[in-house]
């Protein structure tokens, strides 16, 4: 059963708005980095001599199903965006993005020292919470929602290799999460979640998409977790 809209505003964005935003981002990129022309039409030395910047590389089994190449929302297009804006372009993170907005925690994703975001997929939220419980979290229990989101935030912008090398990290909720390397460019978190597309580089943050909701809230989702009638 398809879950109805449960956020203060639509959890998805019209294609026209996305396309307009993409065109605006391209135009801004061209102004900032593209032609580098002076008033006399001569390319600036910085623009003429700069080497092309390597495109961000994401890894994990879900990456092939997410925007890539020249698609809006591809890793390179998201690289300079604020985290809360970048989340809107990732189609498997509509619930997480809605939770960030509903909780009022967008500013927490723009911390000066950076942040690592362990973002569960929509399927992960559906497996964890019933539709009624998820509605309640998003619309009526802001404190619990903020606590849940802090279970998925780590201070500092850390790549997947950084997390694996550390072996464990502490979330903003104060929970210690173990991190072990896995195959196919993935990692295992808290012995229950795997990264499925890691290393989105956005402004001041890294986004790692994971397949399980972290934290200790009770599980009410799954096959029996549909909305009560």
Segments the model singles out, each with a brief description of its role:
Residues 2-229:
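Mature, structured domains of secreted/extracytosolic soluble proteins
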